[in-house]
From Swiss-Prot:
Job of this protein: Component of the adaptor complexes which link clathrin to receptors in coated vesicles. Clathrin-associated protein complexes are believed to interact with the cytoplasmic tails of membrane proteins, leading to their selection and concentration.
Protein name: AP-2 complex subunit mu
A GO BP entry: intracellular protein transport
Domain of life: Eukaryota
Lineage: Eukaryota, Fungi, Dikarya, Ascomycota, Saccharomycotina
UniProt organism field: Saccharomyces cerevisiae (strain ATCC 204508 / S288c)
Amino acid sequence: MISGVLVYSSRGELVLNKFFKNSLKRSISDIFRVQVINNLDVRSPVLTLGSTTFHHIRSRHGDNLWLVTITRSNANSAAIWEFLYKLDAVMNAYRLDREEALKEEFMIVHEMLDIMLGGNGIPIDTELNSVIAQMSVKPVRNMGGLLDSPDGNDVLSSSSSPTSSAGELHFPKFLTKRSSSFLGQGDSTSDFYDNNKITWRPKGIIHKKDEVFLYVNERINILVSRDGSILKSYVDGTIDITTHLSGTPICRFGLNDSLGMQSEDEKKWLAQQQRHSGSDFGNKNFIPKAAAGSVLLEDCKFHECVSLDKFNRNHIIEFVPPDGSMELMKYHVRDNINLPFKVTPIVTHSTRDNEIDYRITLKSLFPGKLSAKDVVLHIPVPPSTVDCKISVSNGHCKFVPEENAMIWRFNKYNGLTENTLSAVTVSTSDTTQLNLQQWTRPPISLEFEVMMFSNSGLVVRYFTISGKDSKHRAVKWIKYISKAGSYEVRY
């Protein structure tokens, strides 16, 4: 979102610049100086020249420095200005709001920007306490008051932070930059779950009943060719969670992903879960029937509360959840997809009466103990069709002229069952064989929803909660929901 950050003195001298896009050159700073700083008539906090936009503010402290961002996309201006004011506050905490101090300790600001914007220019962490906790150098005084260090000690009283007789700050030598990702910070779990970093969960939450609801939502997308071969198939999934937990709980669960099952830490946790009985997600009764073996997860994206360092090392998902509902992660699966339905269409053209004859078989492939709801098969017909003679073994089917389709519906469809449809179209009197031959034959599409069935085979193998302030045992629920995305069959 942000391509670069510039800091000017009150006179218009460029003091600091940091670019996140290689396409930017240092000469771009001259454009802002000429168009805004040297132009007293400009009062707008945003300037757009072609595809380049400058957002700027004046620092409210010290030498009233110019803080400027450069963007080359349709960025959110409100978010950028909020970032600039947060940057101003952090710089003030480090007494870097004066030109001379900024020139001497400019690398401190570079580290701030690495933490606040990451490596791609997108604001990821702008909370003052959280940013300071991740900095390699701590400020001695924060806006005229005392600033507590992450370990709870007063930084001002520490002998490791030297000050001169004039009261000016002298920072120790800059060592190394920390990771630009907030979620991967720290070498220990306790460092990641520092209360200063948990900005998404208030302190002191109390619930009469501790509960966790985990939802594995999947949408299967598939395209079947005329000969029955699968042209493409993949699953887009999300794991949503609703928590009502007291205190500051640390939740941890494992999946049967192929990399995670090879982790030694994962094996230890699974063995521990198998030794304990009770209503846990590790219980086989909570595993969907379609799941088997391991699953290769791709393109995983996580909520900010998840410890990426833990996932990258051991493929264990560990987090302090916000109170309420949220989307915990997204994932993508392409291999070993479990198909819930098989559609076998036989569509022929009768040259004698200009009719289209349909013989369609719909078979459910999920276990017989399960059932699907809201099953809808959308069967296209030629635009010249005025009616259809339909016969079905089960369900309800009708011709919908405004959609040029037959709609076959089932309120409930049991597993391992098969139903058939036979239909003949009735065309208008002026319909010719050429019209029917030129018909593009749009694919048949299917809609459905199956509970406790996993299209990808993904399984939550265990779920544990620690650090909970409540004395009551948390009740944990899990639900697998499989739906159709783009489920199409050619004929």
